[in-house]
């Protein structure tokens, strides 16, 4: 699902920006207020693109989305990562599953408190990998809230048109 397979799927980069909330250390992306998505009626980043839309709804409900980022863990700072949305979501920190919202469902939330991850060492850099699959054909909700200072990670290099 989450990688290009020639003849099976295609991809394109879709950036999102987490906005720092006033007078806080929280960063939020919310499809209901984001200028790119608020008028689309949900998180629909590829309407009319790639393999097209579902039926005649004008919405492309069937897609996956990946975020590959990193952060420096600071022990005792109360850092959290919260996702609210529908359908499948898996979040891994340092290769360990920390959020599992698998399955087709209405919008639900799950939070990971990083201080509860006893394998993390303060001052070290860790990966955060986020996997989202939109499979249902009614809504697409997508909200991230975090206190982590997430960094961009360069995408892997390609040696050919498809690896």
Protein language model regions, located:
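Acidic/polar, compositionally biased interaction segments
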Residues: 1-163
